[in-house]
Design a protein with these regions (language model features):
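Extracellular/periplasm-exposed beta-strand and loop segments of Gram-negative cell-envelope proteins
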Residues: 53, 120-126, 135-146, 176-182, ...
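Outer-membrane beta-barrel initiation region
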Residues: 14-110, 164, 174, 178, ...
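C-terminal outer-membrane beta-barrel translocator/porin domains of Gram-negative envelope proteins
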Residues: 44, 92-93, 139, 186-316, ...
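Flexible, solvent-exposed coil segments and beta strand-coil junctions
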Residues: 40-47, 69-77, 126-135, 177-189, ...
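Residue-level detector of the transmembrane beta-barrel scaffold of outer-membrane proteins
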Residues: 49, 77-79, 106-110, 162-166, ...
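Outer-membrane beta-barrel "beta-signal"
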Residues: 347, 365-376
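Single conserved hydrophobic/aromatic residue that forms the stacking wall/gate
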Residues: 2-9, 13
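Transmembrane beta-strands of outer-membrane beta-barrel pores
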Residues: 52-59, 68-70, 82-88, 111-119, ...
Length: 376
């Protein structure tokens, strides 16, 4: 996995009422949710969301999460929010959001405890690693026990700019299994099979624009950070990430969405689960890892409208996608770029829950996935 998972941004909502006066003049009245108003009703909201996935790489994993949102006298747009979830494969997760009353600053607390079934794929380092197609999928799987705590503080600099400062305290322990590929790379007494603690610091700068009606999203994000092994402080590394994403609207129903992302590690003292990787949808997770990575994926999306039925509002659409990317690793000479291609269908019901079916192929094989829910 990539070395940093940034917190999701939280929108700030403002109610705007417009009144018509004499002489065709207009005034705008804003109700600022973050101001104290004793007439506001104090209440809380509890919601439940199913969450599941079937993936030809990961297998089946079902779960759910509960969201508790408190609306006090001061809101931006709420007073605070807790989300607690469990997934059969990933384990327990918690996400807390605590916005400042002016709506311009937010504190995030994220934590997770992996389940005993949690794993990551490991195929070795480099851009030319073998796919081990003749082996069973378990051969490249590594059971990984993790505990993570990741606080972050986010502030709005200007209307379209957000700055996030984050920290991390993580624990990893890879399970030693004799008949797995990892055992051929790391010796029996290698520290990778012991409990390792890591501390990290970093910052992310994000710009999100909506410049034109035909370009409703243009976003760039830059991250710089540093991680250190607490048991072996000499094993530490700085890193940087950058991404650029956009949506182009050709019509009300036809859009093009794309994301480019690059990762650079500035030292060699990292573990395989901290390496730079590429998310190509036709390959297994972490199929290629290294010291630097770059990839781009793009989708053409067609909104097919609504399906009439007597039970629930149902929207659906089609998409086709193409991905490419590669990694770089010291001492390896490779000119290969990896590609994947495919498509699928998505369904939204109750205007809230989404299911997505996708199929993507590559030089290794193909990957089929079915997703349900909103994600965590």
């Amino acid at each position: 996995s990539t070395p940093i998972k940034s917190s999701a941004a939280s929108d700030v909502y403002k109610r705007q009422n417009q009144y018509q006066l004499n002489h065709s003049r207009k005034i705008h009245v804003y109700d600022k949710d973050y101001k104290y108003d004793y007439q506001k009703i104090k209440y809380h909201k509890i919601s439940f969301t199913p969450w599941g996935i079937y993936d030809s790489d990961k297998g089946i994993s079902l779960g759910t999460f509960f969201t508790y949102t408190m609306y006090g006298f001061k809101r931006a747009p709420f007073t605070y929010q807790h989300r607690i979830g469990y997934n059969y494969l990933k384990g327990f997760m918690y996400a807390g959001v605590f916005p400042n009353y002016d709506g311009r600053r937010r504190l995030y607390l994220n934590a997770s405890i992996s389940s005993p079934r949690n794993f990551e794929n490991f195929f070795g380092f480099g851009n030319n690693t073998a796919g081990y197609k003749e082996e069973k999928k378990n051969y490249n799987r590594v059971k990984l026990r993790t505990y993570m705590f990741n606080p972050s503080f986010e502030m709005d600099l200007r209307k379209e700019e957000v700055m996030t400062f984050f920290g991390s305290l993580d624990m990893y322990k890879a399970k030693r299994t004799d008949d797995r590929y990892i055992y051929t790379v790391y010796g029996e007494d290698h520290p990778i099979f012991r409990t390792n603690y890591f501390v990290g610091l970093g910052a992310t700068y994000r710009i999100t624009k909506q410049p034109y009606s035909w370009l409703p999203l243009l976003e760039t994000e830059w991250t710089a950070g540093w991680k250190m092994n607490l048991k072996k402080p000499e094993r530490n590394f700085p890193y940087a990430q950058g991404s650029l994403s956009w949506n182009v609207r050709f019509s009300d129903r036809f859009t093009w969405a794309s994301l480019m992302k690059a990762t650079v590690l500035f030292d060699n003292d990292y573990e395989f689960y901290q390496a730079a990787t590429i998310d190509l949808r036709g390959f297994r997770d972490n199929r290629f890892i290294g010291k630097q990575s770059f990839y781009q994926y793009s989708d053409l999306r067609l909104d097919m409208g609504k399906l009439k039925n007597p039970f629930t509002p149902l929207k659906y659409g089609l998409f086709a996608g193409f991905d490419y990317g590669r990694v770089w690793f010291p001492g390896e000479r490779s000119h290969s770029w990896h590609t994947s291609y495919g498509g699928g269908i998505w369904l939204t019901f109750l205007n809230k829950f989404t299911t997505k079916y996708s199929w993507f192929g590559s030089t290794d094989s193909f990957r089929f996935a079915f997703e349900l829910g909103l994600g965590f």
